Amino acid sequence: MILAWIIKYTDSARKQLKKLDKQSAVRILDFMDERISEETNPRASGKILKGPKLGLYWRYRIGSHRIICDIQDGQLCVLVIKIEN
């Protein structure tokens, strides 16, 4: 049995998502819910952020948008922190 990863959004990420056009928002939500949550290793589809304070965060590219996430292995949770264009 494969456990699905839980996708959660910070309040600021939700606000950023609401500011996007509907098509972009749906594309991001679909990507996170259908692709990332079903992966055995969500890191396989992303890139680690590099820098002294950024080593714990991962980035996904969806079209022209960048999704910044914290992958929490102990809870099988991908926390979306920021959505940038």
Which residues are covered by each model-predicted region?
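A short, surface-exposed loop/turn module that caps and links secondary-structure elements
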Residues: 34-59
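Enriched for short, Lys/Arg-rich terminal
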Residues: 1-6, 11, 15-19, 26, ...
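Residues in soluble alpha-helical coiled-coils and helical-bundle/repeat scaffolds
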Residues: 19-22, 36-37
